[in-house]
């Protein structure tokens, strides 16, 4: 099961619909605090978390850290419209020094997102690092 956290409802809905068309089970939340509460209550159900980086109340890095405290082996993909270089500099390099499995720049070609997510879910030993090119 996949959890999506993005304060942009339209983007979250578009990703959710796309993944559901691939027969994946997806929960989508505009508020990271609500998403965290859901994850906490059903952590064993989730294999993958996709989160925006810049959200109110809690940014994507903080959200990812909380998720990893609950379930350390869950896969996490962060996404942002600002690009990898900007996000890495703005947050003092957390992408390089974290358990984030992948970074995707918005707007996301949905076929690329689906390919990455299916690859990660089908091979949990494969760990994408954000500085490695994604398929």
Question: Predicted segment positions?
Answer:
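Alpha4 helix (beta4-alpha4-beta5 surface) of REC/receiver domains from two-component response regulators
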Residues: 62, 83-104, 111, 115
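Active-site residues of response regulator receiver
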Residues: 52, 80
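Two-component/phosphorelay signaling modules centered on CheY-like receiver
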Residues: 9-27
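C-terminal output helix
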Residues: 105-119, 125, 129
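Short amphipathic alpha-helix used as the core "switch/output" element in two-component signaling
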Residues: 37, 61-73, 93
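Acidic catalytic/metal-coordinating carboxylates
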Residues: 30-31, 59-63
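Acidic, metal-coordinating helix/loop segments flanking the phosphotransfer/catalytic sites
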Residues: 28-48
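Receiver (REC) domain active-site loop signature in two-component systems and cognate sites
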Residues: 55
């Amino acid at each position: 099961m996949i959890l999506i956290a993005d304060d942009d409802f339209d983007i979250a809905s578009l990703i959710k619909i796309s993944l559901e068309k691939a027969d994946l089970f997806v929960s989508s939340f505009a508020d990271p605090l609500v998403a965290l509460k859901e994850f906490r209550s059903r952590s064993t159900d989730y294999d993958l978390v996709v989160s925006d980086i810049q959200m109110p109340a809690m940014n994507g890095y903080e959200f990812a850290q909380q998720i990893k405290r609950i379930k350390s082996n869950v896969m996490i993909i962060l996404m942002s419209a600002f690009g990898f270089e900007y996000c890495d500099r703005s947050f003092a390099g957390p992408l390089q020094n974290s358990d984030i499995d992948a970074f995707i720049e918005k707007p996301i070609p949905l076929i690329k997102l689906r390919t990455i997510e299916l690859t990660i879910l089908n091979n949990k030993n494969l760990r994408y690092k954000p500085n490695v090119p994604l398929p």
